Design a protein with these regions (language model features):
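Long, terminal "pre-/pro-" and other extracytoplasmic accessory regions
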Residues: 2-185
Length: 185
C-alpha cells in the first residue's frame, strides 16, 4: 500500500515538473517568436515594409555572409535608430555574436560579441534549438518564401516546440505581414 502511495506521489511530482517545463518552454517560444512583431509599433512596421521593398540583399544572403563569423542561429531585418539593418546572431564555439550585414552589398559590416543579458538569453535559446535542427535557417526561409509568392522574409527565429526545433519565419508583402512555422528536424 505504501509503495502505491509513494509511486502516486512520484508520478504527481514528475507530471507537475513536466507541466512546468512545458509551460516555460511554450512561454519562451512565444516570446522569441513574437520578438519582431511586438518590438515594433505599427508605424515602425510600415517603415520597415517600405524600406524592405527596395533592399537588394535577401535575408538568406545575409545568413550566408554571416557564416564567416559562426553558425547563424537567427536573423532579422530591423530598424535601429530609424535606419534599416540586417542583424544575424551567430554561435561560434559557444560564443555568441551579432553580425550586421550591409543590406545593400551583402557583406559583413561588423560583428560584436553579445553581452546584453536579454540578447544573450535569446541567443542561448536559439542555439539550443539549432543544435537539434537538421535543416538550416536559410533552408526554412527558402521554403517559406516559395510557399508565399511575392513575400520577402523579414526574420527567421528558431525555437523549440514540444522538444522539436522550428523556425518562425516572418514575411511581408506590401502592408501584409504573416508569420509561418517551418520544421527544422
Amino acid at each position: 500500500m505504501r509503495r502505491i502511495a509513494a509511486f502516486r506521489q512520484i508520478s504527481v511530482v514528475a507530471w507537475t515538473f513536466g507541466a512546468v517545463v512545458a509551460g516555460l518552454t511554450l512561454a519562451m517560444c512565444w516570446t522569441i517568436g513574437s520578438t519582431v512583431a511586438s518590438a515594433q509599433s505599427p508605424g515602425d512596421r510600415a517603415q520597415l515594409a517600405r524600406e524592405m521593398s527596395a533592399v537588394p540583399v535577401s535575408l538568406a544572403q545575409g545568413l550566408v555572409a554571416s557564416r564567416s563569423e559562426g553558425t547563424p542561429i537567427s536573423a532579422k531585418f530591423e530598424l535601429e535608430d530609424g535606419k534599416l539593418q540586417l542583424s544575424v546572431y551567430t554561435d561560434k564555439d559557444g560564443r555568441f555574436a551579432e553580425v550586421i550585414v550591409d543590406h545593400k552589398s551583402g557583406k559583413v559590416a561588423k560583428a560584436e560579441a553579445i553581452t546584453d543579458a536579454d540578447d544573450l538569453s535569446h541567443a542561448k535559446a536559439q542555439s539550443e534549438a539549432m543544435a537539434k535542427a537538421k535543416r538550416s535557417l536559410d533552408a526554412a526561409a527558402s521554403v517559406a518564401m516559395k510557399q508565399n509568392k511575392d513575400y520577402r522574409v523579414v526574420s527567421v527565429m528558431p525555437a523549440l516546440k514540444g522538444g522539436h526545433p522550428v523556425a518562425e519565419v516572418t514575411l511581408v508583402k506590401g502592408k501584409d505581414w504573416k508569420t509561418v512555422s517551418e520544421k527544422l528536424d
